[in-house]
């Protein structure tokens, strides 16, 4: 196949040399148009190599970040998501902040119907922290889904 397929013109990172940022960089996130907007479906990202810094001690924190969402018009491009998550490597934030920041940045990028983000952080001092946050588009059935998922998440 030659040329750029329809919808891929929106993306700038695929096929180009990867430059890793050393600072928190939400601007690296890219979105493309969902070709199946008439369907409800789940997209899941498992990100097992997430790293951030404790804002107090400067020690590294490690986690698997899980992102589930139901797209609307836009979807996040996976390489840009990888670079975005990598940008937390030298960013100081508590575990709870990390998952909320990630969710809010993805909402700003895509305006999904529904999204949830949770982090399974490696134990520190014998305690693991597993923060969860979610969002459903206001005034829609996805808002009700968010409420139900929050009530049943464990």
From Swiss-Prot:
One of its GO terms (biological process) is queuosine biosynthetic process. The active site is at residues 54, 61. Pathway: tRNA modification; tRNA-queuosine biosynthesis. It catalyses: 7-aminomethyl-7-carbaguanine + 2 NADP(+) = 7-cyano-7-deazaguanine + 2 NADPH + 3 H(+). InterPro entries: GTP-CH-I_C/QueF (IPR043133), NADPH_dep_7-cyano-7-deazaG_red (IPR050084), QueF (IPR029500), QueF_type1 (IPR016856). Substrate binds at residues 76-78, 95-96. It is found in: Cytoplasm. Its main location: cytoplasm. One of its GO terms (molecular function) is preQ1 synthase activity. The keyword Oxidoreductase applies. GO terms for cellular component: cytoplasm. Its EC number is 1.7.1.13. Keywords: Cytoplasm, NADP, Oxidoreductase, Queuosine biosynthesis. Belongs to the GTP cyclohydrolase I family. QueF type 1 subfamily. Catalyzes the NADPH-dependent reduction of 7-cyano-7-deazaguanine (preQ0) to 7-aminomethyl-7-deazaguanine (preQ1). This is NADPH-dependent 7-cyano-7-deazaguanine reductase. The gene is queF.
